[in-house]
Regions:
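Glycine/proline-enriched, intrinsically flexible loops and inter-domain linkers
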Residues: 1-74, 80-318
Length: 318
């Protein structure tokens, strides 16, 4: 699908060039980039000048630190102080780190703009080489794409004081045997902001996938969905509450291997401006708590319960 999309894009670009000529097409490409740069610069101008620092930790203790310096319509984002690359696959390639930065900038703009390099023109980004946000080419990175990317967004929003932390994980769940494999991700609580409480049971930031309908899941696989509901009270308490996470219980009707890749099981989503943190997530098999990253052999009758994190709250409720 990706190859086909690229080929389609190349054909359409050839059609544009044939119709309007390279000078006109190149000029409009530049206009689009200039527009993105201008809108980003205007958004930065609305932020207070000065330095804004924040740090957070992954569940295994690895630190992600950032210092953002705002000067008028320009911004410097420096991840100095972030820990070195890890021995596991929670490292995020530089491209993923830059994607998280670009996402935050587009949120700042507050209106739809084409995704292009113009958004980054008013911004200087410094990422220490060899850190977990810019590891060497031989470093493992798969989980960094879906988990660490969330924490990068959290520290950027934390430094700018824009929102409390959202659930901060994709809650990746996979199971299967020699005949089938299934993969799903679960939403959780969104962080509250100065204007409104966080949404409940949603994917945030780097994730946007949906769960399979229970009827389809139970028809195709030896699985029974026992519970799928909001995790009431898991959002942080404050002037604006954080969103609630989810509870999902799956009963296995046959033996299978089960893996869970998740975060925010140790370090809770932070609150902002005196708001309380969201509840940490939990992974349980037959009532026994599992690690945040784990693979186990499940038997028929076993029940996997995933409780996803709530979002942090904004402001003191008093």
């Amino acid at each position: 699908a990706q190859i086909a999309a690229n080929e389609k894009g190349a054909r359409l670009l050839d059609e544009l060039l044939a119709r309007y000529g390279i000078e006109v097409v190149a000029a409009y490409m530049q206009h689009i980039q200039d527009n993105a740069a201008e809108l980003t610069a205007r958004a930065i101008e609305r932020l207070p000048d000065g330095q804004h620092a924040f740090e957070d930790r992954l569940d295994d203790g690895a630190r992600i630190a950032v210092r953002i310096t705002v000067r008028g319509s320009t911004m410097e984002i420096d991840f100095e102080g972030t820990d070195d690359a890890l021995g596991n696959n929670l490292n995020a390639p530089r491209a993923v780190t830059m994607a998280a930065v670009l996402y935050v900038l587009r949120v700042l703009v507050g209106k739809p703009i084409p995704l292009n390099s113009g958004c980054l023109r008013p911004v200087t980004v410094r990422i220490p080489k060899g850190s977990l946000l810019s590891p060497d080419p031989d470093a493992a990175v798969a989980a960094g794409n879906v988990e660490t990317s969330q924490r990068i967004v959290d520290v950027l929003f934390g430094a700018l004081g824009l929102a409390a932390a959202s659930q901060g994980t994709m809650n990746n769940v996979t199971f299967g045997d020699d005949r089938f494999a299934y993969y799903e991700t679960l939403g959780g609580g969104a962080g509250a902001t100065e204007r409104q409480p966080g949404a409940s049971g949603v994917h945030t930031h780097m994730t946007n996938s949906k769960c399979t309908d229970p009827e389809v899941l139970e028809t195709r696989f030896p699985i029974r969905v026992r519970r799928f509901e909001l995790r009431s009270g898991s959002g942080g308490t404050g002037a604006h509450a954080g969103g609630d996470g989810l509870i999902r219980e799956l009963e296995f009707l046959a033996p299978m291997r089960v893996s869970v890749l998740s975060e925010r099981r140790v370090v809770p989503p932070y609150g902002m401006r005196g708001g309380g943190p969201g509840a940490r997530g939990m992974n349980l098999l037959n009532g026994k708590e599992l690690a945040h990253r784990v693979t186990v052999e499940g038997s028929a009758g076993d029940v996997l319960r995933v409780e996803t994190p709530g979002g942090g709250a904004w402001g003191d409720s008093t």
